[in-house]
Structures are given as C-alpha cells and as structure tokens.
Amino acid sequence: MTNAIKLVTLLDVLLICLLTLSAYFGGWLGEALYYVAFLVPIIVGFYCSEYFKRKREEVAGVAEEPDELFSFSFGKAKTLLPLIAPTVAIVFTASLLTSLFLSLFGISSAPVENRNLLTMLVAHALAPAIMEELLFRYIPLKILMPYSKRGCIFYSALYFSLIHCSFSQLPYAFIAGVVFMMIDVALGSVWPSIILHFINNASSVVLMKYGSSAVGTGILLGVLAALVIVSVVCIVLKKKEYGELMRGAFDKGEAFVYTPALLALVMMCGYLAVTNL
C-alpha cells in the first residue's frame, strides 16, 4: 500500500510540474502542453499499475482476473441514473457554500472566459471529464483499490482537490472526488465518474452562460430540484440495493499512509493556491 501511495503521489507531483511548465507558453503550444501534462502521468501510471499487478500475482501465486474498469453494462447504467441529480446537487451546494464563505475574506473564483457554448462545453466539461477522471479515478482504481478501497477513495479525492491549486475549489473538489470514487468503486467502473464529471461541469457551464438572469437561474435550479426529488424517491424504493452497493465500496484496508511525497505535493499546491489569490 505504501509504495502504491508513493507512486500515485509522485504522478501528481509530475502533473503539477508539467502544468507549471505549460503555463509559461501561450497559444496552441500552451494548450498542447496542458493536455500532454495529463497524458504523461496517465501513461506512466498505467504501465506502473501493471508492475504492481505482477508483484501481487507473484506474492499470491495466482493470476488476477483482468479488471473491467472500462466496462459499463446496462445494469450499471440503470443503477447510476438515480445518482446523477443528487451528486450534481451535492457538488453544487458544496461549491456555493465554499464561495459564500471565501467571499467573506474577499476571495472569489477566477472568471471563466465567455465563449460559444460548444467551445465552453468541450474545454470545461468534456476535456476535464476525460483527462481528470483517467488520472484521478482510473489510475488510483488500478493501483490503490487492490490494496484498500477506503484508501483509494480518500487519496483520489485528496489529489483531485489539491491539484486544482485553488482555495475556492478545494473543498467542493474533495467532496466531488469522494462521491465520484465511491460510485466508481461500488460499480467497478470508471465510466460513472466520467459521466458525472461531464454532467456536473456541463451544468455549471450552462448556468454561467444562461443563468445570469434571475429567471434563468430559477428555471435551471428548479429543474435540478425536481430531478433530485425523483431520484431520491427511486433510491428510497431500492434502498436495500443501494445500501449494499455503498457498503461494498468500503473495506477494512488502510485508509491513510503518510509519505514525504504527499507533504511535497501539499506544499506545492498550497504555494500555487496562495500565488493565485
């Protein structure tokens, strides 16, 4: 578990270094380096996960079953559907409360460039849903989950929140990370968090684009509230199934292991968060 934590932590340190490098370049080169900054740790993490798998097989003396983290059956889709609206509502509420608290100290989120809707959806919803979920959910699922589901959930959420390097995003990113990974672990697939991440970010983009008026905001929030109510009713009707599903997302493995690399990551992200104020 400790070596696995060290590896995942170092992958995120590598990401921070590469993102910092990409920030020095503008235009298409800066954009390209931004995506390369995610691709490099993802590729390294994938190959390292195969190394850890071989080591576990050597110790156990038996071959492990191939993972099905990219599988997404119709049954899993039906289970995920009622979880979408409540998840978006939880993340939205956490984001709103964080913004209100930080506004007391004069801290606000950086404005998002107002471009056409399709461009904003690709840049702020689709790309993050794929790149961030592969790095912060898929890689921990492959490397950490075989040792501890609780540790996998905690660390993936911690890294996901730290890497935003923003005090205004850290709390709700951690909450989103916990919820996303819990659902991924429970369903045994990375697709739920990719879908949830995209829908959550797309909802924020639509709200920013068309929710400037009180009427627009009211309509969007009203639709979300109605979907949450319907979803909660569906979950309550199948509370035994969902209860067993969520309990299966936890185990008695190690939930926290300290490594110097983690301290280095916290210090790097903290420094960048302060400089971004």
Locate predicted features:
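Transmembrane alpha-helical insertion/packing segments
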Residues: 1-30, 126, 135, 207-209
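Membrane-helix interface and helix-disruption motif detector
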Residues: 1-3, 24-34, 174, 209-220, ...
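Interfacial transmembrane-helix boundary/kink motif in multi-pass membrane proteins
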Residues: 2-13, 35, 57-94, 245-267
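Juxtamembrane helix-loop-helix connectors linking adjacent transmembrane helices
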Residues: 22-32, 61-134, 138-146, 273-277
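Membrane-water interface of transmembrane alpha-helices
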Residues: 43-60, 229-243
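Transmembrane helix-loop-helix hairpins at the membrane interface
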Residues: 120-274
